[in-house]
Amino acid sequence: NAAAGNVTIEDIGTDVNDVAITGGTISVDGTIETADLSTSDAGGITLTGAVTLAGNVTLDTDSSNGPISVTGAVDATNSGTQTLTISSGSGAVDFGGVIGGTTAIGDTTINASGSGTIALAGIGDANDVGAIIGTTAIGNTSTAGITFDGTNYKCGNPAGGSDTVTITATGTGQVIDFTGGAATVASFGGNAATTGNAITFSTGTIDLDNANNLTITSDGGAISVAGIRGDSSETVTITANVT
């Protein structure tokens, strides 16, 4: 706990039950992994403060099914280079800050398996540029719910790339929720010769809270949505040929 100071972390292994780190900036390089060492407390990871990816980073509580919480912004050291992998089993994942809002991160996977819920405050900002450069995979067919509680979710292809954005949750019910206001999900090409990522909401119906209009756009990438429902009279705009 460094309060307003900076904290630098490399690997933390499986002989730790809980990890809680607080700092003005938390620099992470490597894997933080918890173990199920307590009968009363599922091993979790809490990062309180802004996080910088100094290398490829994995946060893993899969063996303990513990929660993963990151309260601040998450940025890469070099745009589109450092990757992020999250695995929490049945534990909840919550990103309270914007991902890639200042410096875009690389390929990102959040819960390729497990039923844990996922909450994301934002990917990028109002600028028309991808905040995750590469492949983005959020959830899987067992994910109990995904909540987008911000307004901007913007990904991008690297120059010459053909990466994808895939959001997946259980196919039962309206389990992909937009709750933070009028939201935009968008993808952008890396240059004039590169289309934006294909965007796929593969399973799980999108639910739009009252007055939470939704815009989905791409620079030519295909867009596929399994289903959308609104709570009142929300507006949905889908455009796959924005340039």
Which residues make up each language-model segment?
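Extracellular lectin-like interaction modules
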Residues: 1-243
